[in-house]
């Protein structure tokens, strides 16, 4: 039988809320040679659309990336099968919007809750606040090494961390110039200038490379000293450290390198210092990233070069689950409505894991393949539960629908001076509603890409 004339019975349906996009629930025959574009033509014909709408198609929850014939063959199904095919508005390619020029490599990114500001951390040790015109509104200087993580806390506070082994709480200001908020530290902040350090948080013994902030005033940090630490955004809740006494005590036996670091920070001797609320120890290798559980801020997840994903009870400071993989893990993001943790690895792929599954059961639910180097950053789309973006040392950001194992789109660096494999590594990515996909890296650029319909289901 010729593949040009072979047909299969299909029944189309959609979960789109817009009733005008619904078709009658009636089976019909379609050529098995059709792919997404041909199926989209059929649905648009049924809808009698004046302007064609691009659609994606799913069968049994899996995105169709081949012809119907290839799908039937792969699944071992005959053309006598009736296929129930779901259609949904297609995610359109994200287009290049802007580049903001930074002084050094961009290693960390976050955005304000109102999406009016971008916060960046850089290898020059400076944290910056950017407006959406690409202007630096504020610089926060104090770190003595590269800034590897930055997080927005409130309109008067951010936190950063880096290679100098410390975290810093910074004072910012409201748009109206006021500086008060409900942090519990207001009375002590009156004499501290905007852009200055409120407190230095110490306790890690190696670079601090990841931060996350929860709504209950808690901070998590991940370090290359193999530990995760829990802190508060309210410095009064943490134990004070007498930094100057520690430095000046002649009985302290410290290395020459440590003495040098402490000499560099003597200028910050008047800044309050705080110890962590708890130190979480279980990893046997550098911890690359840590996050709070989206629905329960007493639970955290971390990934490490020791090949493991760990689940933490932050109330008792205990590791309550360990999932062991076959490769170093470098990044993690939660997809809460799907009950999945996405993890980027040193072997170039992204794996999806269900944190509820026992560590003795099958660990990996799905593997996303497409990158050609380390996957060092992940973020999810707040408006579409299936979408994920990833940053890699291969010089790209990829957009994924996790119902498929292949990337939907690839975003490359747009600076013409970038040389592939020389200065194109991407270190950080943030997917922000109303802004787009923000990425930064070795090209010293904060790049913004945005696509129509990219946030819609």
Swiss-Prot record:
GO molecular function, one term: ribonucleoprotein complex binding
InterPro entries named in the record: G-protein_beta_WD-40_rep, NLE, WD40/YVTN_repeat-like_dom_sf, WD40_repeat_CS, WD40_repeat_dom_sf, WD40_rpt, WDR12/Ytm1
Pfam assignment, any one: WD40
Record region (Disordered): 172-191
CDD domains: WD40
Keyword rRNA processing assigned: yes
Chain segments carrying region Sufficient for interaction with ERB1 and association with 66S pre-ribosomes: 99-457
S-S bonds: none
Subcellular location: Nucleus, Nucleolus; Nucleus, Nucleoplasm
Main location: nucleus
Residue numbers spanned by region Ubiquitin-like (UBL) domain: 8-89
Superkingdom assignment: Eukaryota
Gene Ontology process terms (BP): chromosome organization; maturation of 5.8S rRNA from tricistronic rRNA transcript (SSU-rRNA, 5.8S rRNA, LSU-rRNA); maturation of LSU-rRNA from tricistronic rRNA transcript (SSU-rRNA, 5.8S rRNA, LSU-rRNA); protein-RNA complex remodeling
Keywords: Nucleus, Repeat, Ribosome biogenesis, rRNA processing, WD repeat
Subunit details: Component of the NOP7 complex, composed of ERB1, NOP7 and YTM1. The complex is held together by ERB1, which interacts with NOP7 via its N-terminal domain and with YTM1 via a high-affinity interaction between the seven-bladed beta-propeller domains of the 2 proteins. The NOP7 complex associates with the 66S pre-ribosome. Interacts (via UBL domain) with MDN1 (via VWFA/MIDAS domain).
Free-text function comment from the UniProt entry: Component of the NOP7 complex, which is required for maturation of the 25S and 5.8S ribosomal RNAs and formation of the 60S ribosome.
Name of the featured protein: Ribosome biogenesis protein YTM1
Organism this protein belongs to: Candida glabrata (strain ATCC 2001 / BCRC 20586 / JCM 3761 / NBRC 0622 / NRRL Y-65 / CBS 138)
């Amino acid at each position: 039988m010729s593949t040009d004339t072979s047909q299969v019975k299909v029944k189309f349906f959609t979960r789109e809320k817009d009733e005008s996009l619904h078709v009658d629930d009636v089976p019909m025959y379609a050529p098995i040679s059709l792919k997404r574009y041909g199926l989209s033509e059929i649905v648009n014909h049924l809808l009698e659309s004046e302007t064609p709408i691009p659609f994606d198609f799913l069968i049994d929850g899996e995105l169709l990336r081949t012809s119907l014939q290839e799908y039937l063959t792969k699944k071992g199904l005959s053309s006598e099968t009736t296929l129930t095919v779901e259609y949904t508005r297609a995610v359109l390619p994200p287009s290049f919007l802007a580049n903001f020029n930074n002084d050094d490599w961009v290693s960390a990114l976050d955005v304000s809750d109102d999406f009016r500001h971008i916060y960046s951390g850089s290898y020059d040790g400076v944290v910056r606040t950017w407006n959406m015109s690409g202007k630096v509104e504020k610089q926060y200087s104090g770190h003595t090494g590269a800034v590897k993580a930055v997080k927005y806390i409130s309109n008067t506070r951010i936190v950063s961390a880096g290679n100098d082994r410390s975290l810093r709480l910074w004072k910012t200001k409201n748009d109206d110039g006021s500086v008060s908020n409900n942090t519990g530290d207001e009375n002590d902040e009156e004499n501290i200038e905007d852009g200055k350090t409120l407190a230095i948080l110490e306790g890690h013994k190696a670079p601090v490379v990841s931060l996350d902030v929860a709504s209950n005033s808690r901070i998590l940090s991940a370090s290359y000293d193999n530990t995760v630490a829990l802190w508060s955004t309210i410095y009064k809740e943490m134990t004070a450290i007498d930094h100057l006494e520690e430095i000046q005590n002649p009985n302290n036996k410290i290395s020459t390198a440590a003495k040098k670091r402490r000499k560099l920070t003597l200028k910050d001797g008047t800044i309050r210092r705080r110890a962590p609320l708890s130190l979480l120890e279980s990893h046997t290798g550098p911890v690359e990233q840590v996050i709070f559980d989206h629905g329960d801020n007493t639970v955290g997840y971390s990934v490490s070069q020791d090949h493991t994903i760990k689940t933490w009870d932050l109330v008792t400071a205990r590791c309550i689950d360990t999932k062991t993989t076959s490769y170093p893990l470098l990044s993690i993001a939660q997809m809460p409505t799907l009950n999945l943790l996405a993890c980027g690895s040193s072997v170039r792929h992204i794996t999806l894991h269900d944190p509820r599954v026992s560590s003795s059961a099958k660990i990996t639910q799905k593997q996303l393949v497409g990158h050609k180097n380390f996957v060092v950053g992940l973020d999810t789309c707040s408006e579409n539960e299936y979408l994920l973006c990833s940053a890699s040392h291969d010089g790209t950001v990829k957009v994924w629908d996790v119902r498929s194992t292949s990337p939907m789109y690839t975003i490359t660096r747009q600076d013409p001076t970038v040389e592939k494999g020389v200065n194109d590594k991407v270190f950080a990515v943030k997917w922000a509603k109303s802004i787009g996909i923000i990425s930064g890296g070795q090209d010293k650029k904060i790049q913004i890409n945005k696509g129509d319909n990219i946030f819609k289901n």
